[in-house]
């Protein structure tokens, strides 16, 4: 029997909004349900689990979690059950994400974190969309399948980073020129001026061109688009891509370039131009200022609701002021709106907000419980209007459909221009660069992974694990190195060395200022009262968070963060590993073909 795993999302009424689980989980749950008398014996071997059965079995633990949160402000992060089964919890916009598995705790927590990120990309703050629109829940399932598959097979995805294929300058210029011409031709044909064209090969970043007015494409959004492209091509209905006219189009909400995600509406078109070679077009649609302020309003309203439930009134005034500011930004963004449906929805929103505002102000002035109860009731209607406004201003099926034909033509332009180098870049992606030429300078070194956590770009020699013999470095050992190091990083350890019978392993994370001068933190990364989030990029930038913790008086934008993982054969002294690490970091631009510079990725 396989390992059991499942993901469930519950709303505030403990109803199931979404479920994704494997057959082992279904079999186990149905057997329990028959024992409990909530499922007839003849349904014991069904291939699905009814929602009412899940609610019956999980309501006690979900309710307990909500009580721990609301009454004590001290929710569970995980529960270990008899037999090794683990249940992990996470929360987003009042929805409870529950992950169940028999594997390592960090892996289940990471899966929950990725699930929240994917839900935000697909639905923004309105998680209920997963129940209301089956297309969304199906796409979420496909994305999670792709992530799980890539996590097990792609080192960069495991690290939530981007691997860039290194091309010589002349080749790079001709690729960018081809992408530029495709974007320029698109701008003249469709009603959109903010466009990115990204070329990806075997889930690796090859090149990007962005139109002048487009917002910078963040590493988070690039990584998401790679997983989306992988999911699209794997799940194509014909199973055998005809690259002459295949296109996959999606409406998503990207994070944007700022440190906290903003849910910016984009149409994404993925066009395969050869096997494992995709052009991804990003069309920025709608009003980004409105989308950002709408998302902020959802976030601050959710915080207000949490404060009310937890009765933590000492922080209510600043939370209310944040909500008021976010609503003002929404109103300002809609001043020039000419759409009748949006205008009608906005008027309703303003009316409800004015009533809410009076009640919150009344409560803050004289702590009147009745005023707070009334504000809470009004907030429910206000939330529904917010959802409607979000849908009206971010969904634009028209541009998604009308731009498809032009995008296919633009992709053909690129495909023709790059025809002579397609095979070369595919081979280059498989063997980006080899460690062989550096073995003399770094005796004993068999593998390293260097990650610039400003651009989230990873530099690492290519290894064909299929060719390796079991006694040499295996994929399992490299994956364990990464998981082990990140588990300790979450606990606050930024330097680590350990060994097994064959290899010595090392992990270091450090900070530099913009001049490359090392920075030493005087603030400990963790304390007994605070746990760090799961290391990663897609849900929230963990590395941004630790910059803020370690250097509270410095702007995070002035701090650069790096990590390096090293594997040496045999026993190696600590000074040798440290010296190799320093020299590797200093010469990494030679390996990657360009200096480490935050703007290089773009």
Q: Language-model segments: what does each one mean?
A:
Residues 1-602:
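Intrinsically disordered, Ser/Thr-rich regulatory regions of eukaryotic membrane-trafficking proteins
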């Amino acid at each position: 029997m396989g390992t059991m795993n499942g993901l469930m999302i519950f709303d505030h009424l403990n109803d199931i909004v979404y479920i994704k689980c494997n057959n082992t989980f279904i079999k186990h749950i149905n057997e329990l349900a028959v024992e409990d008398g909530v499922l007839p014996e003849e349904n014991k071997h069904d291939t699905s689990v009814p929602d009412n059965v899940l609610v019956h079995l999980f309501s006690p633990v979900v309710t307990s979690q909500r009580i721990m949160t609301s009454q004590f402000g001290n929710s569970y992060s995980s529960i270990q059950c008899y037999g090794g089964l683990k249940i992990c919890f996470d929360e987003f916009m009042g929805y409870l994400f529950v992950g169940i598995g028999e594997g390592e705790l960090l892996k289940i927590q990471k899966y929950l974190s990725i699930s929240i990120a994917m839900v935000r990309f697909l639905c923004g703050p309105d998680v209920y969309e997963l129940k209301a629109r089956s297309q969304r829940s199906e796409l979420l399932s496909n994305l999670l399948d792709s992530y799980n598959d890539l996590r097990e097979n792609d080192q960069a995805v495991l690290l939530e980073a981007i691997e860039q294929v290194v091309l010589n300058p002349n080749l790079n210029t001709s690729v960018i020129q081809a992408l530029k011409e495709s974007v320029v031709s698109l701008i003249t044909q469709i009603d959109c001026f903010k466009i990115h064209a990204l070329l990806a090969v075997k889930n690796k970043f090859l090149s990007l061109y962005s139109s002048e007015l487009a917002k910078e494409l963040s590493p988070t959004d690039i990584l998401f688009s790679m997983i989306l492209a992988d999911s699209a091509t794997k799940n194509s209905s014909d199973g055998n891509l005809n690259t002459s006219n295949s296109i996959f189009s999606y409406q998503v909400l990207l994070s944007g370039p700022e440190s906290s995600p903003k849910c910016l509406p984009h149409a994404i078109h993925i066009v395969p131009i050869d096997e494992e070679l995709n052009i991804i077009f990003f069309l920025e649609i709608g009003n980004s200022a409105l989308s950002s302020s709408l998302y902020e309003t959802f976030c601050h309203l959710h915080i207000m609701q949490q404060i009310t439930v937890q009765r933590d009134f000492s922080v209510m005034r600043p939370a209310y002021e944040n909500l008021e500011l976010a609503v003002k930004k929404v109103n300002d963004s809609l001043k020039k709106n000419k759409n009748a449906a949006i205008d009608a929805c906005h008027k309703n929103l303003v009316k409800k907000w004015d009533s809410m505002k009076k009640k919150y102000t009344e409560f803050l002035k004289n702590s009147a419980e009745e005023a707070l109860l009334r504000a809470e009731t009004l907030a429910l209607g206000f939330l529904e209007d917010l959802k409607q406004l979000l849908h009206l201003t971010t969904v634009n099926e028209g541009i998604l459909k009308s731009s498809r034909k032009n995008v296919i033509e633009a992709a053909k332009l690129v495909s023709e221009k790059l025809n002579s180098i397609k095979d070369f870049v595919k081979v280059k992606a498989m063997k980006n660069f080899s460690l062989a030429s550096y073995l003399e300078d770094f005796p004993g070194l068999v593998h390293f992974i260097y990650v610039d956590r400003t651009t989230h770009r990873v530099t690492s020699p290519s290894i064909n694990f299929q060719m390796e013999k079991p006694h040499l470095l295996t994929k399992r050992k490299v994956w364990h190195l990464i998981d082990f190091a990140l588990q300790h990083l979450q606990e606050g350890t930024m330097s680590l060395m350990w060994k097994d019978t064959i290899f010595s392993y090392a992990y270091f994370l450090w900070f530099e200022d913009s001049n490359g001068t090392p920075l030493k933190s005087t603030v400990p990364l963790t304390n007994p009262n605070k746990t760090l989030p799961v290391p990663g990029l897609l849900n929230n930038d963990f590395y941004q968070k630790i910059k803020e913790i370690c250097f509270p008086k410095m702007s995070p934008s002035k701090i650069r963060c790096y990590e390096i993982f090293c594997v040496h054969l045999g026993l190696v002294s600590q000074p040798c590993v440290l010296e190799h690490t320093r020299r590797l970091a200093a010469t990494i631009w030679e390996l990657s073909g360009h200096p480490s510079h935050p703007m290089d990725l773009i």
